[in-house]
């Protein structure tokens, strides 16, 4: 089972050119421009919180990276904080002094109050010099608030003890749990990668189960909407087929089966009951080849078609229009397939 873990660093895994679920989903959601743009979300509070919950539940050995923010001075607003964090990055990367010109350049980059005078922008940042120094002094840690830590602890405890989720963490004899499993495989002719939050292997019943952990700002009963919005179905289908390929190629596990894919969701505000969204395995093929939601007559593109389009855009270096537009040579027709009357 150890060989399921890639013999590479986390950075190497991130930098590989294999397609990830997030890149494929971003393309389907935002179009080809998403293939050449990368949003820096590393400093966003919801990203930090999600990572904290992941580490508490799945990788407690990483908790040394976190430190409670005990700064007692006046805290900057979120917009000024973004500028200050960028200033810290500049100092750490260059080792240079933070001049007024650098502050103005960062303010411009961050679209920080464009109508403010230059002197006002500089003063707004310099006002929090003590806070900037505090961040620099703790540069080796991910600073979090006491509230964030406490909520994360409660979420982890709920997941570990609630009846619907406990079974994936309080394992029985003959079961094994593997956290943060990184895989790179081929899928339908393309190289793909996936970071599996948790795999539970039952050697008695000869099964695998994939569990993915999600956190977010929406309430528990709204997660199903997030499932469609953020294309989590792509993740379920891709990861299922990736694991299927790996175990099919391993003599030790060739007679094991993969159970339904499971998402566990907890809102960042905490909840008494975890949201468990199960993707029945017989739906994976539909997600691959195209599918309808409910009684809608609109057919969504499947994973195979989406990856095919992504590969086309990379190969042809076209990112401003869709491959469908190029294949049609820019020509469209409104016919009976798009518009129907009552008697048609």
Where are these regions (language model features)?
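Metal-dependent nuclease catalytic cores that hydrolyze phosphodiester bonds in DNA/RNA
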Residues: 1-193
């Amino acid at each position: 089972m150890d060989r399921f873990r890639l013999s590479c660093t986390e950075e190497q895994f991130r930098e590989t050119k294999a397609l990830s679920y997030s890149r494929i989903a971003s393309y389907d959601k935002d179009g080809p421009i998403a293939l050449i743009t990368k949003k820096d979300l590393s400093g966003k509070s919801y990203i930090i919180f999600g990572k904290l919950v992941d580490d508490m539940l799945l990788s407690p050995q990483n908790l040394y990276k976190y430190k409670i923010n005990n700064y007692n001075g006046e805290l900057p607003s979120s917009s000024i904080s973004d500028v200050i964090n960028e200033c810290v990055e500049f100092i750490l990367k260059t080792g240079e002094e933070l001049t007024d010109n650098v502050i103005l350049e960062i303010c411009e980059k961050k679209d920080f109050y464009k109508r403010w005078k230059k002197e006002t922008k500089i003063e707004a940042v310099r006002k929090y010099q003590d806070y900037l120094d505090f961040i620099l002094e703790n540069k080796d840690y991910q600073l979090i608030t006491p509230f964030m830590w406490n909520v994360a602890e409660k979420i982890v405890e709920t997941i570990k003890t609630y009846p619907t989720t406990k079974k994936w963490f309080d394992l029985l004899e003959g079961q094994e749990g593997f956290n943060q499993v990184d895989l790179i495989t081929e899928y339908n002719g393309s190289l793909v990668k996936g970071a599996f939050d948790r795999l539970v292997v039952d050697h008695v019943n000869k099964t695998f189960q994939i569990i993915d952990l999600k956190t977010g700002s929406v309430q528990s009963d709204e997660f199903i909407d997030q499932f469609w919005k953020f294309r989590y179905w792509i993740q379920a289908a891709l990861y299922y087929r990736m694991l299927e390929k790996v175990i099919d190629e391993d003599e030790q596990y060739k007679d094991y089966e993969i159970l339904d894919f499971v998402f566990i969701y907890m809102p960042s505000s905490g909840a008494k009951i975890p949201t468990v969204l199960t993707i029945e395995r017989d739906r994976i093929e539909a997600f691959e080849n195209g599918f309808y939601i409910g009684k809608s007559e609109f057919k969504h593109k499947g994973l195979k078609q989406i990856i095919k389009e992504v590969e086309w855009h990379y190969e042809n270096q076209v990112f401003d229009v869709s491959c469908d537009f190029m294949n049609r040579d820019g020509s469209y027709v409104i016919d009976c397939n798009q518009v129907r009357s009552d008697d048609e």
